[in-house]
From Swiss-Prot:
This is Adenylosuccinate synthetase. One of its GO terms (cellular component) is cytoplasm. NCBIfam families: PRK01117.1, purA. HAMAP family: Adenylosucc_synth. It comes from Pectobacterium atrosepticum (strain SCRI 1043 / ATCC BAA-672). PROSITE patterns: ADENYLOSUCCIN_SYN_1 (PS01266), ADENYLOSUCCIN_SYN_2 (PS00513).
């Protein structure tokens, strides 16, 4: 039988999923995106060459791998074409390697206009979205008025449906938000110009994945964002609009949940967050600056500087519960090099003095939380690029062991640099 492995983030995104997916796809036949959209930013460094992908799965650079965008992904046609064009200019035959679900909702210009108008109207209470129309596109999906990739097979009917939706959203844009209307004809012309390219890549994803499983193929499911940004389980309302957790694999691809064999949680050796929302372990002074600069903590999608802080093991434990994690991949260990001591958040103290060891569900519940820290010794030696587990400093090994003890999950992979080769695979998920 085949093996289905899920790779997802255990924190607030930006954990280093892209590199790990790219590494593990060496053994995979398919790589599947199952949620999110081009608000993701997955950075791959292969032989020193950097590639940033937002929508196309990270397996696209491997010639023996088929990349799939599942129904749980909201797809911006213009963003997909831009990414395809850039990759094709580098000699990557994207159209031979990429497949799409016809059930993918389309992100169109009115979604982007709504996203930006709403963020502006929220003022100081802005969520910090990427402004790419992700949330409004999911809204249209749930309201059952959204257009999907499959609608492009019938261009005349697509035009009629689009006109109704543009009129609906333009009313809100013009009358409530007092911004310009979206040009229906331009939207229609732009989408129809590339419709045939998109429909040529359409496949029944659920059927494909089921048959792949029966054949014994290895499949990798690539998560975007992170567990604490999940629409249901994250720091609501400072979350994304999709299910970033393991449950999203089944609903976002059509694979039966019993067929998931291993869930790999990517955990950064410290914490980061982009945009607004709770972040109990956030650091503002010298150590925070160290993590930000040494870790190059700037968003691959937005370019925004990420907030940085100590590892929040309470939040990571929540990710263990929700995702039924099989193992961790620890990333950016080298960023902690040179710190005399390292702190791990093992609990929270509420404003009334009560100590808790689980995360609140809504953002309001995080207000006034104080992290309870455990301090461990740091190390002065460099871990950058180390490929042999036994050659890591003893203090680094102790830190790794402590994370395993607190979370109850083994660290199966350790990343010590951005390049694909700078990785230690202690237990391969496809063999676990």
């Amino acid at each position: 039988m085949g093996k289905n492995v899920v790779v997802l983030g255990t924190q607030w995104g930006d954990e280093g999923k892209g590199k790990v997916v790219d590494l593990l796809t060496e053994r995979a036949k398919y790589v599947v995106r199952y949620q999110g959209g081009h608000n993701a930013g997955h950075t791959l460094v292969i032989n020193g060459e950097k590639t940033v992908l937002h929508l196309i799965p990270s397996g696209i650079l491997r010639e023996n791998v088929v990349s799939i965008i599942g129904n749980g992904v909201v797809l911006a046609p213009d963003a997909l074409m831009k990414e395809m064009t850039e990759l094709e200019a580098r000699g990557v035959p994207v159209r031979e390697r990429l497949l799409l679900s016809e059930a993918c909702p389309l992100i169109l210009p009115y979604h982007v206009a709504l996203d930006n108008a709403r963020e502006k109207a929220r003022g100081a209470k802005a969520i910090g979205t990427t402004g790419r129309g992700i949330g409004p596109a999911y809204e249209d999906k749930v309201a059952r008025r959204g257009l999907r990739v499959g609608d492009l097979f019938d261009k005349e009917t697509f035009a009629v449906k689009l006109k109704e939706i543009v009129e609906y959203h333009n009313f809100q844009l013009v009358n409530y938000y007092k911004v310009d209307a979206v040009d229906y004809q331009k939207v229609l012309d732009d989408v129809l110009a590339i419709a045939d390219i998109l429909t040529a890549m359409v496949v029944d994803v659920s059927d494909l994945l089921y048959k792949a499983h029966l054949r014994g193929d290895f499949v990798m499911f690539e998560g975007a964002q992170g567990t604490l940004l999940d629409i249901d389980h994250g720091t609501y309302p400072y979350v994304t609009s999709s299910n970033t957790t393991a449950g999203g694999v089944a609903t976002g691809s059509g694979l039966g949940p019993r067929y998931v064999d291993y869930v790999l949680g990517i955990v950064k050796a410290y914490s980061t967050r982009v945009g607004a929302g709770p972040f109990p372990t956030e650091l503002f002074e010298e150590v925070g600056e160290h993590l930000s600069q040494k870790g190059n903590e700037f968003g691959a999608t937005t370019g925004r500087r990420r907030r940085t802080g100590w590892l929040d093991a309470v939040a990571v434990r929540r990710a263990v519960q929700i995702n039924s994690l099989s193992g961790f991949c620890l990333t950016k260990l080298d960023v902690l090099d040179g710190l005399k001591e390292i702190k791990i958040c093992v609990g929270y103290r509420l404003p009334n003095g009560t100590e808790v060891d689980t995360t609140p569900l809504a953002a309001e519940g995080w207000e006034g939380l104080e992290p309870i820290y455990e301090t461990v010794p740091g190390w002065s030696e460099s871990t950058f690029g180390v490929k042999d587990h036994s050659k890591l400093p003893q203090a680094a090994l102790n830190y790794i062991k402590r994370i395993e003890e607190i979370t109850g999950v083994p660290i199966d992979i350790i990343s010590t640099g951005p390049d694909r080769s700078e990785t230690m695979v202690l237990r391969d998920p496809f063999d676990a």
